[in-house]
């Protein structure tokens, strides 16, 4: 089991943060990174949903101490409904906060081939488009850091063999057996058996599909100007820009994208000007000065964007959209 050379090259020249749970996947990735002599620290969420949750946290602290690594831990609140989405949002918000505050270049995730195929099937079942169906990439640029998934083309069976061969300790997550979570239902009934039998062909297919995705959507069309992400008025490009800001859109939200200026998920704003989409963090301002409002009116700056420009002292004349 090996990490690709191009991913290793990135890891060796940046400051790295590993999302760690002490489950099988992140434990395997921990020791694989150690084997490759990659420097990294740990970040962990304790959801307190399992009987071993606090023990996992304690053991993670001991592991970090043993190998001289920093570890950042946060306890999640009890989510009353829609656990999967709320837990994911909570997790990534904390990961991003640590990356920004501690200047990490890379957030390393332990997603593997089985996860990639599960995601594919989940999105397919929801009627998603190509950009969402192929939502996982080995290297995914966010605004201030990059997501890296070194195990994305490695199967769960290969990870299990690595753990057994190296005699690596990890905690079994019993919640993975609970089919009330949609991902677990897909895993148990559809994806795992398929990946076990056809993993080599699946790896090739996902590799080809990713190349096709890049050519089709040309994500280089997303430009950044002073914190604003700007792209042509194209649903998939806009969804990608929103994801770069840390928000994964639902099918219902995607349907609203091209209808006009809006706020997505209460935190990401979308505005249009001259057939260009502008994606940015949603902000408000108590009162805009009259002269600034007039400058915005003359320049035809979308109303939703004005508070952001004012708060960040962005010169309107410097904007090229």
From Swiss-Prot:
An example Gene Ontology molecular-function term: tRNA(Ile)-lysidine synthase activity
Gene Ontology cellular component annotations, sorted alphabetically: cytoplasm
Pfam families associated with the record: ATP_bind_3
Binding residues for ATP: 21-26
Swiss-Prot/TrEMBL keywords: ATP-binding, Cytoplasm, Ligase, Nucleotide-binding, tRNA processing
Listed EC numbers: 6.3.4.19
Keyword flag Cytoplasm: yes
GO biological process, one term: tRNA modification
Transmembrane segments: none
Catalytic reaction(s) noted: cytidine(34) in tRNA(Ile2) + L-lysine + ATP = lysidine(34) in tRNA(Ile2) + AMP + diphosphate + H(+)
Enzyme class: ligase
Highest taxon above the source species: Bacteria
Keyword ATP-binding recorded: yes
Subcellular location as annotated: Cytoplasm
Annotated PANTHER family: TRNA(ILE)-LYSIDINE SYNTHASE-RELATED
Domain notes: The N-terminal region contains the highly conserved SGGXDS motif, predicted to be a P-loop motif involved in ATP binding.
Function: Ligates lysine onto the cytidine present at position 34 of the AUA codon-specific tRNA(Ile) that contains the anticodon CAU, in an ATP-dependent manner. Cytidine is converted to lysidine, thus changing the amino acid specificity of the tRNA from methionine to isoleucine.
Family: Belongs to the tRNA(Ile)-lysidine synthase family.
Protein name: tRNA(Ile)-lysidine synthase
């Amino acid at each position: 089991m090996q990490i690709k050379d191009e991913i290793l090259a990135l890891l060796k020249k940046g400051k790295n943060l590993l999302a760690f749970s002490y489950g099988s996947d992140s434990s395997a990735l921990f020791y694989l990174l150690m084997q490759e002599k990659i420097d990294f620290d740990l970040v962990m969420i304790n959801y307190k949903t399992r009987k071993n949750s606090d023990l996992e946290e304690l053991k993670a602290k001991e592991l970090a101490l043993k190998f001289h690594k920093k570890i950042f831990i946060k306890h999640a609140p009890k989510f009353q409904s829609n656990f999967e989405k709320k837990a994911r949002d909570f997790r990534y918000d904390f990961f991003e906060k640590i990356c920004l505050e501690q200047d990490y270049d890379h957030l390393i995730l332990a997603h593997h081939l089985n996860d990639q195929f599960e995601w594919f099937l989940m999105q397919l079942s929801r009627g998603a488009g190509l950009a969402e169906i192929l939502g996982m990439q080995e290297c995914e640029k966010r605004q201030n850091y990059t997501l890296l998934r070194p195990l994305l083309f490695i199967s769960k069976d290969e990870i299990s063999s690595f753990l057994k061969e190296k005699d690596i300790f990890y905690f079994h997550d019993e919640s993975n057996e609970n089919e009330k979570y949609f991902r677990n239902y897909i895993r148990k009934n559809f994806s795992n058996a398929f990946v076990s039998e056809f993993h080599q062909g699946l790896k090739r297919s996902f590799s080809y599909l990713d190349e096709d995705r890049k050519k089709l959507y040309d994500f280089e069309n997303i430009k950044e100007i002073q914190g604003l992400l700007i792209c042509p008025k194209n649903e998939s490009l806009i969804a990608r820009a929103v994801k770069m800001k840390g928000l994964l859109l639902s099918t219902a939200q995607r349907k609203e994208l091209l209808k006009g200026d809006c706020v997505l998920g209460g935190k990401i704003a979308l505005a249009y000007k001259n057939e260009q989409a502008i994606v940015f963090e949603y902000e408000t301002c108590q009162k805009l000065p009259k002269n600034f409002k007039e400058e915005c009116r003359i320049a035809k700056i979308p109303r939703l964007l004005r508070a952001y420009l004012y708060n960040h002292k962005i010169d309107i004349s410097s904007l090229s959209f």
